[in-house]
Amino acid sequence: EDIKLRLTTDDWGDICGIPTNLQKNELEDEFISYGDKETLDENYVLLNNFAYNGNVYGIPSTGNAQGIVYNKKVFEEAGVTELPKTPTEFIEALQKIKDNTDAIPLYTNFAAGWTMGAWDAYIGGCATGDPDFMNYGIVHGENPFADNGDETGPFAVYNILYQAVSQELVEDDPTTTDWEGCKGMINNGQIGCMVLGSWAVVQMQEAGDNADDIGYMPFPITVDGKQYASAGPDYCYGINVHSDYDNQLASMIYVKWLTEESNFSYDQGGIPICVGDEYPEVLAAFDGVELVVDNPAPEGEEDLFGEINTESEIALNNDNTHVQNIVEHALSGDMTMEEIVDEWNQAWTDAQEEYDVTPAPYVYGSGVVAE
């Protein structure tokens, strides 16, 4: 929110990480274009998030594969011999950690707030295996948060959190979690796992003497017998459209160096941004897991997800309140997960209708809604 507010001053600086809640139709008013997307796609990946009308306004700092940071030693001591591939198997693994070790099975990082928003990153590719879901399926689909009954889709993601909290498989008091402190805690075996992007792995490894104990597993959802992992950009470098030409040129050169020469993405355990660059060892557990990159929205609908998302006030990937509410309701027991998503679906449907979208059943991977 701070940087979005500062953008209104025009003289905020030369380079920033583009706010994720900036609407696509605002990009050209704030940032220069790096060039046309078709040309840039030849050398760089994960450009869809800040591409608009054929131009690219943000170059990713690194790419994230969405999974779970975990302590391998804790899982081993708990008797978890195979990484869980479904929500049921994951909750069972957390229960084993609780029963057989002194570690906190799943650390929510509730108090930090922004960390809770990480859960939104799993409802697309990880939960559906569908590159069209986030920019088409959820936009046009009917009741996208409903329980599919097969442990897939957005409901399955959020229900993992709900069940972990309600079954007391998290810290005793989520309001007292400590983001900086949790890094050392997972490093030394006091925490079993945390739901965070691959960007977090290196931080956990460097927080103590047990770097080799830190691993990264695919998110435990299986769609038609196969696991998927959402892959997307971390913060993207944007260059101020209001800066003078010399500063814009210098900024462009600096972003090029950061992307192509600095080794930043590899050092952070991220997906490389340059086509053909080497993947880091931390993603070894993703061998056989298909990475899913969201397709761009259909032409003419580039702003539609953002508009519905804002109108619904759910604010996926923009706010953490809806995810924190899951924890609060699970703790108090005053609402089931089904009741929570009923409210979300109603708000989403109302927002769809506000923007002249008639929701219809959507099948993952189909790319179309039912007639």
Residue map of PLM features:
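Short, solvent-exposed loop/beta-turn-alpha elements that line the ligand-binding surface or hinge
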Residues: S33-N43, N48, C126-A156, E206-D209, ...
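Extracytoplasmic/periplasmic substrate-recognition and gating elements
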Residues: V56, E77-A78, Q167, E206-P272
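Hinge/lid segment of periplasmic solute-binding proteins
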Residues: I18-G67, I91, A118, G215-M217
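A structural signal for short loop-to-beta-strand junctions that line the ligand-binding cleft
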Residues: K4-L7, G13-D14, T39-V74, I104-T108, ...
